[in-house]
């Protein structure tokens, strides 16, 4: 109403006036929300762009108007339910002038209307108002067509360029310049619009559009701007394609109906139009930036079609006054209109229909919907009867003709702009086409063109019939689609994306196919009347498409392959061949779009599709998923495999897809793993949340982009690269030095194994679930593996938890995404590869465990032991631990048990570094994600610089804790040092993870020092030989570090961190891995105990008795003895604390101890350095291997490791 009543004038004035004021004043609802200043600035910039665009692209605007007119025409036809109306309107030659004006008006008017359209849709929520607007628009269009036709002919020729120039310079003048016709058309509206010529109108509409959309959603505007940019790029890209396809497009119209011809003509002219449309697109994009997300998307998707339909609708209805701007724009664009005279005719004809349809589109009235539905049904039937063959022929002809123009093959003229826009719009259109359905429904050609453009795969007559029927179905569901679009826009990031996991992601993956999916679901769900047969046809087609898509998808494993293959084999034979490559052509564009859009828009369209699919597509989706799912699911898995897997229900249907996923496993795994990392790390706690799913989908889409590239690479390579790079590299990146050392020591094999296992693990569980389920299953399996294989279980468990998450991951997956495991199991290659990888990993880990045991025994301090500890760390103990801090006890127990097994294997290694490193690794690694951490852990274990490793591990732990914070590991890591309270448990985990798991265990219990002591006793007993000195240091660091770090220093952070750096760092650095890892661990655990002590000083009793007596007794006995000698201050935990802090029990005393201990740690550093100068040198050597100084890592990275949890957590 606002637009109808005052907005046109306001729109014209608002832009030229203060951009802000007019918007706010004139569009109270829409523009008042927007920031006038921002609007004016952006609008001014956009107006400039629009002016230049209009000047350059007058013809394009005419073309755009024609498109809008076409859409409007189609919409009108649909709205009026009179398919003959189009031809009649099209046949109106005088309408050309009017159309030129109208079409010319439309470009800016549409742009304005694009803004207005959203505004109208947003502002005019009353059906009565919408109906009134629609009626007024229709009447106005009729009157305008009659009145503007005479003057339009004269105004267009002479005034077109002047108003164009004037429009470029001052748009108010061109308005009079283009005068007579515009006056005829615009007199009532020129008055409102006269003040602001097209430019001002556009400005106002931009301003308004910007204002209201900006107020509506800056995110949407941003996304739309991204879309606009993407569309621009795609349009530029497709411009050439369109130009190429223009010939074919021109050829195709012959077979097409008049409407098809008009569409084709308007699209044939797009070479010029395309250029102009691109300008318009840029302008509209600008508008879209500010447009309400939904309408912006609508405008963005079929911008030339949908946007202009909506724009025309709203221009006519809401921006009737803005029509004068159109005349001025028409005058400006008349040159372009002359070029697109026929297009202008079509535009005019379509415009009348479009305006009527726009009213229906914008109003979304039940009556309009009914009219549109009726018309669409009639038209669909007629087209299905007669048009479909022609269109099918055209489509088939086009399929061969525009192979370069992938969409044109499926699209009538491949709608050059539609094709250009299709990549962006395909997604959007997939989304929007369902929504544009209302406006573009009666333009079954246009919707079909868009749909076909989107889904060129259905290039077959059946496909076309399906699309036609779907169009009618969409017409039926136009209101639903619009509502769904709005809902999807709102919830696009929530449920729709995940819901569409199978179909949606497939649709997202194959934009071409995705229209099919939505159209399928839409058609099936919406047009139950005629869609039952259509649905069956669609399902049959989709089944064929799914079969061919599955075959091709298996062959290509890329969405592109599935896109082309999705077409029925027979249908695809002609168009499929073209479309497959053609779809590939859009795929890069889509990839660019997805990259630019972050896949967000694909999701939006996909969610809509999924909504539709979920709505009624459930039948068709289930049916066609059953059939087409092979093709769909594969893509779905790569695209949203994780989300789909998260959608357990779809996961079942994805069984076939997962089977294919083995082929696309590289992609799917990568996507899953990436999503698993991101989502499991960031949102593993809220895997069930739609946002997380959306994020996972985004990640999956990103992964898919990467996978598309990697997809082209060998799948195995992709897996390795993907798995390792995503999961393991993710850790290894943080463990860069460790990873290098690990690599240096030959864990590359393990890496590959781990990569595979991780890859499989990621595949099996479906990333997020794997992180969650895999974590649990891995814990369970790892526990079992720990009992099965000690050192091997450590290593294998890490990889086995990865690889076991491959083999066992199936159980693990079965926990979460059983279908995925099933599909993976179905995927013999994945199962075989998983099993073989798991076996290889286990073998390699067993060998490496032996080597590590030998090397760590040789090294005693256990850089390798740490590495071994790394495997021990991967023990699910840690994972379990994150789940239950008491699990730290279990973890420590398991660390004790398994680590002790490993330690038993490791012997001195365990006693030395393994005890510390192993416990540390277990603690650090286990806590984060035993398997995931385990993977990097081997680098640690292998890598020298244990301190660096330990630090990295601690970081890793911290990081892992963060990653697993959803799991509670992050709190553990943070708690480890940062959150000492939970640190006692989580911190114990982190500390245990970080350092002495024994201590960690004891820490959770410091309470359970006996387990920790037990473990320390056992593991440290093993350590004791190598730890005699370490015992001093580790114990020294642990008691004083723990105590001072204890809750005090560490809790205090600065002192704790410093002291962790100093004491723990030195201890850690000094003992290198064993001590470095163990000291901080002890520090962490003693730290936890220290916390306990610092809490009350009872820790002196608790810590001393437990840690002091048990840990110090068994483990620290040597430590204590050695320490007592080497560091009197560190005589024993009690002695140490008491010596250092005298008042061990008191935190302040501990704080003093922290400082004192730090001093002691400094001296201890000296002492340890002196005592362990050799060890420090070893650490330095190892750390040098890591390329970092032990003390530096100890202080700095210890901050990260010991303090990592403390400081950096």
From Swiss-Prot:
Residues 301-321 have a biased composition (Polar residues). It is found in: Nucleus, Nucleolus. Keywords: Nucleus, Phosphoprotein, Protein phosphatase inhibitor. It comes from the Eukaryota. Residues 201-219, 352-362, 821-836, 852-861, 1187-1209 have a biased composition (Low complexity). Residues 57-91, 145-279, 291-471, 501-532, 555-694, 733-836, 848-1033, 1052-1072, 1118-1209 are annotated as: Disordered. Ubiquitous in normal tissues. Expressed in numerous adenocarcinoma cell lines. One of its GO terms (cellular component) is nucleolus. One of its GO terms (molecular function) is protein phosphatase inhibitor activity. InterPro entries: PPP1R26, PPP1R26_N. Residues 63-91, 226-255, 442-454, 609-637, 667-685, 757-766 have a biased composition (Basic and acidic residues). The modification Phosphoserine is found at residue 1161. Inhibits phosphatase activity of protein phosphatase 1 (PP1) complexes. May positively regulate cell proliferation. Interacts with UTP20 and PPP1CA. This is Protein phosphatase 1 regulatory subunit 26. The gene is PPP1R26.
């Amino acid at each position: 109403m606002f637009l109808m009543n005052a907005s046109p004038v306001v729109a014209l004035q608002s832009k030229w006036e203060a951009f802000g004021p007019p918007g706010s004043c004139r569009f109270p609802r829409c523009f008042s929300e927007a920031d006038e200043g921002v609007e004016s600035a952006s609008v001014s910039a956009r107006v400039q762009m629009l002016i230049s665009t209009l000047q350059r692209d007058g013809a394009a605007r005419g073309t755009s108007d024609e498109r809008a007119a076409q859409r409007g025409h189609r919409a009108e036809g649909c709205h009026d339910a009179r398919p003959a109306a189009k031809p009649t309107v099209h046949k109106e030659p005088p309408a050309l002038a009017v159309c030129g004006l109208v079409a010319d008006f439309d470009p800016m008017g549409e742009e304005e209307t694009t803004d207005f359209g959203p505004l109208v849709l947003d502002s005019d929520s009353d059906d009565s108002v919408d109906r009134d607007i629609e009626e007024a628009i229709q009447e106005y269009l009729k009157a305008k067509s009659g009145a503007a036709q005479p003057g339009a002919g004269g105004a267009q020729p002479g005034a077109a360029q002047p108003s164009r120039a004037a429009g470029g310079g001052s748009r108010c003048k061109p308005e009079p310049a283009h005068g007579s016709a515009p006056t005829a058309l615009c007199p009532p509206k020129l008055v409102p619009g006269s003040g602001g010529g097209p430019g001002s109108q556009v400005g106002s509409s931009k301003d308004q559009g910007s204002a209201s959309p900006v107020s509506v959603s800056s995110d949407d505007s941003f996304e739309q701007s991204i879309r606009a940019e993407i569309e621009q790029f795609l349009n530029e890209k497709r411009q050439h394609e369109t130009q190429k396809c223009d010939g074919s497009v021109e050829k195709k119209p012959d077979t097409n109906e008049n409407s098809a011809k008009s569409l084709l003509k308007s699209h044939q002219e797009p070479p010029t139009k395309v250029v102009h449309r691109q300008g318009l697109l840029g302008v509209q994009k600008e508008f879209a930036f500010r447009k309400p997300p939904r309408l912006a998307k609508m405008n963005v998707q079929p911008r030339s079609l949908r946007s202009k339909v909506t724009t025309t609708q709203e221009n006519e209805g809401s921006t009737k006054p803005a029509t004068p701007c159109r005349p001025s724009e028409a005058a400006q664009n008349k040159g372009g209109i002359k070029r697109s005279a026929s297009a202008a005719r079509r535009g005019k004809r379509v415009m009348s229909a479009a305006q009527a349809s726009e009213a229906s589109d914008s109003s979304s009235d039940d009556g309009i919907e009914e009219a549109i539905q009726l018309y669409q049904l009639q038209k669909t039937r007629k087209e299905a009867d007669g048009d479909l063959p022609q269109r099918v022929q055209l489509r088939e002809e086009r399929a061969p003709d525009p192979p370069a123009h992938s969409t044109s093959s499926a699209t009538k003229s491949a709608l050059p702009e539609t094709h250009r826009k299709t990549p962006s719009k395909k997604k959007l259109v997939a989304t929007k086409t369902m929504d544009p359905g209302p406006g573009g429904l009666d333009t079954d050609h246009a919707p079909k063109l868009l749909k076909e453009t989107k889904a060129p795969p259905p290039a077959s007559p059946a496909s076309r019939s399906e699309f036609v029927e779907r169009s009618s179905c969409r017409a039926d569901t136009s209101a639903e689609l619009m509502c769904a679009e709005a809902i999807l826009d709102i919830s696009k990031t929530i449920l729709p994306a995940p819901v569409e996991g199978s179909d949606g992601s497939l649709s997202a993956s194959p934009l071409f196919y995705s229209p099919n999916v939505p159209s399928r679901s839409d058609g099936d769900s919406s047009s139950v009347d005629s869609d039952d047969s259509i649905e069956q046809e669609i399902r049959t087609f989709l089944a064929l498409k799914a079969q061919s898509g599955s075959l091709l998808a298996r062959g290509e494993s890329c969405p592109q392959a599935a896109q082309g293959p999705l077409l029925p084999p027979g249908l695809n034979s002609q168009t499929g061949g073209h479309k497959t490559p053609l779809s590939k052509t859009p795929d890069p564009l889509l990839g660019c779009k997805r990259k630019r859009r972050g896949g967000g828009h694909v999701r939006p369209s996909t969610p809509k599709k999924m909504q539709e699919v979920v709505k009624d597509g459930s039948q068709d989706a289930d049916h066609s998923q059953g059939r087409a799912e092979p093709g769909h699911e594969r893509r779905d898995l790569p695209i949203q495999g994780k989300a789909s897997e998260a959608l357990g229900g779809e996961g079942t249907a994805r069984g076939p897809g997962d089977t294919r996923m083995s082929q696309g496993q590289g992609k799917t795994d990568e996507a899953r793993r990436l999503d698993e990392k991101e989502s499991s790390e960031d949102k593993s706690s809220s895997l069930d949340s739609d946002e997380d799913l959306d994020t996972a989908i985004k990640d999956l889409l990103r992964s898919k982009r990467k996978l598309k590239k990697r997809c082209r690479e060998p799948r195995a390579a992709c897996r390795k690269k993907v798995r390792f790079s995503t999961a393991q590299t993710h850790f290894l990146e943080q463990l860069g030095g460790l990873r290098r050392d690990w690599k240096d020591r030959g864990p590359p094999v393990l890496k590959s194994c781990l990569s595979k296992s991780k890859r499989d693990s990621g595949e099996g569980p479906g990333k997020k679930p794997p992180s969650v389920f895999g974590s649990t299953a891995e814990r369970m399996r790892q526990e079992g593996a720990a009992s099965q294989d000690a050192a091997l279980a450590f290593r294998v468990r890490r990889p086995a938890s990865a690889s076991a998450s491959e083999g066992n991951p199936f159980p693990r997956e079965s926990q979460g995404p059983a279908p995925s495991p099933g599909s993976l199991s179905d995927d013999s290659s994945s199962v075989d590869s998983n099993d073989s990888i798991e076996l290889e990993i286990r073998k390699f880990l067993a060998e490496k465990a032996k080597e590590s045991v030998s090397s760590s025994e040789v090294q005693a301090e256990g850089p390798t032991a740490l590495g071994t500890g790394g495997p021990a760390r991967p023990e699910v103990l840690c994972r379990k631990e994150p789940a239950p801090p008491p699990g730290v006890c279990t973890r420590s127990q398991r660390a004790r048990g398994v680590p002790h097994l490993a330690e038993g294997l490791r012997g001195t290694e365990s006693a030395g570094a393994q005890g510390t490193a192993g416990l540390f690794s277990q603690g650090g690694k286990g806590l984060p994600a035993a398997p995931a951490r385990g993977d990097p852990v081997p680098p640690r274990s292998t890598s020298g610089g244990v301190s660096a490793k330990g630090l990295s591990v601690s970081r890793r732990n911290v990081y892992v804790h963060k990653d697993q914070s959803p799991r509670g590991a992050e709190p553990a890591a943070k708690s480890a040092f940062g959150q000492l309270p939970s640190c006692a448990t989580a911190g114990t985990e982190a500390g245990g993870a970080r350092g002495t798991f024994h201590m960690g265990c004891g820490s959770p219990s410091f309470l359970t020092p006996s387990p920790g002591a037990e473990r320390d006793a056992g593991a440290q007993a093993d350590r004791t030989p190598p730890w005699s000195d370490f015992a001093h240091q580790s114990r020294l660091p642990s008691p004083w570090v723990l105590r001072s770090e204890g809750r005090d220093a560490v809790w205090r952070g600065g002192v704790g961190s410093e002291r962790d750096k100093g004491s723990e760092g030195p201890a850690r650095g000094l003992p290198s891995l064993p001590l470095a890892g163990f000291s901080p661990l002890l520090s962490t655990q003693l730290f936890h105990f220290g916390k306990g002590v610092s809490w009350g000083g009872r820790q002196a009793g608790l810590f001393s008795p437990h840690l002091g007596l048990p840990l110090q007794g068994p483990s620290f006995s040597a430590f204590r003895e050695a320490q007592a000698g080497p560091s009197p201050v560190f005589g024993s935990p009690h002695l140490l604390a008491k010596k250092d802090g005298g008042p061990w029990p008191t935190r302040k005393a501990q704080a003093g101890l922290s400082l004192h201990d730090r001093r002691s740690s400094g001296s201890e550093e000296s002492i340890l350095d002196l005592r362990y100068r050799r060890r420090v040198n070893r650490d330095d050597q190892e750390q040098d291997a890591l390329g970092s100084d032990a003390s530096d890592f100890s202080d700095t990275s210890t901050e990260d490791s010991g303090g990592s949890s403390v400081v950096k957590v």
